[in-house]
Design a protein with these regions (language model features):
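Catalytic machinery of carbohydrate-active enzymes
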Residues: 1-348
Length: 348
């Protein structure tokens, strides 16, 4: 059986979608699974053994471009896929499998995609509370799976593969010392500072960890580089020698390898949080207005700290810097306690 998956366009969603690929492979061991997704996803997909080929989606996230999608679909016809699974909810994301003439096209209804999909699922958000459950449900016939309780347990969570050789090579590439174990911080998050733990809290935690004998490495995109510099600036000269701001300095694949080399990770609700979970790193995840009830880190080594409940549609925080009060209220001491408990568990 040949399967085409139209993958998501965000790091976190792409990571969670691996649970679907793992489930499909477990159900259909002979299946060949290709994933069409933005080209930047390739470093993640190449580390998922279930994925045969990452096919770059050449069209932008917001572009409809029906003519181009038709051409793209027609170019896939020779691959003779048997099934397609469409993970994004947009109308346009269902066009390529339709134009490719794939006989069985499965997905949630999303933007009224009757016709484009011929195996349409209607989402009951209460029956399927977690994003990962919604992905995995598509691997089964809709008559069988009425709620998340019907899914076989345990779910096959995301797992990325990184070798020891890659870790030492990439640490050397970035001149990261092997003298001290690394703790990774992921201080960025989409949609600005409202989902971010304040930089001054990260700085306070970094001071304590460096004084305890760790080195701290900051990860993120170029957009997070300034937040990293703010953390760095709050440290004294001796401490700065043991804190590296790699936000915007690494390719995604290098960040994956370096996160795998970390002893533990402290992170906001972000795509890199899901990467760290898939690498089975002990991690402390800090949530504010966004809710872990929908997209928690999928790992037994994750601890979530959140001081409020429910979902708050807040793109802007309360404080002058745009931080959300519920994240300001999470103290560095509390995070350090959770982190130390995880590190003790890991050593045991």
């Amino acid at each position: 059986m040949k399967i085409l998956v139209i993958g998501p366009s965000w790091v976190g969603d792409m990571m969670m979608s691996q649970s679907l690929y793992r489930t499909l492979q477990a159900r259909y061991p002979q299946a060949i699974i290709d994933v069409m997704a933005p080209a930047w996803c390739r470093p993640l997909l190449s580390r998922m053994p279930e994925v045969n080929e990452a096919i770059p989606m050449p069209l932008g996230h917001g572009a409809l471009e029906i003519g181009e999608r038709r051409k793209l679909g027609h170019s896939l016809r020779e691959k003779r896929y048997d099934r397609a699974y469409v993970l994004p909810n947009s109308f346009k994301s269902a066009l390529v499998p339709f134009f490719a003439g794939i006989p069985h096209r499965t997905g949630w209804r999303g933007e009224m995609r009757y016709g484009l999909l011929n195996d349409v699922r209607v989402l009951d958000k209460e029956a399927w509370p977690l994003m990962v459950e919604r992905y995995v449900a598509l691997a089964y016939d809709k008559g069988i799976m009425r709620t998340a309780q019907d899914l076989p347990q345990p779910l096959l969570w995301p797992q990325l593969q990184v070798s020891e050789g890659e870790k030492s090579y990439t640490c050397n590439q970035f001149s990261l010392s092997s003298e001290r174990p690394m703790i990774g911080f992921c201080p960025g998050a989409e949609f600005g500072p409202a989902k971010r733990w304040p930089h001054y809290h990260y700085a306070e935690l970094a001071k304590q960890l460096i004084d305890e004998g760790y080195q701290v490495v900051l990860f993120g995109s170029a957009k997070d580089h300034e937040a990293g510099n703010e953390i760095l600036a709050a440290l004294n000269i001796e401490q700065q020698a043991w804190c590296r701001n790699l936000a915007g300095e690494t390719q995604l694949d290098q960040a994956v390898i370096l996160i795998a080399a970390c002893k533990a990770i402290v992170t906001n609700d972000s795509g890199l949080m899901h990467v760290a979970a898939a690498l089975n790193r002990p991690l402390v995840a800090l949530y504010g207005p966004s809710s872990p009830d929908f997209t928690p880190p999928l790992s037994h080594k994750a601890r979530v700290i959140r001081l409020i409940t429910g979902y708050h549609k807040v793109r802007k925080g309360d404080a002058a810097e745009g931080y959300h009060q519920s994240l300001i209220d999470i103290t560095p001491q509390r995070v350090l306690e959770e982190l130390n408990a995880l590190l003790l568990q890991e050593e045991a």
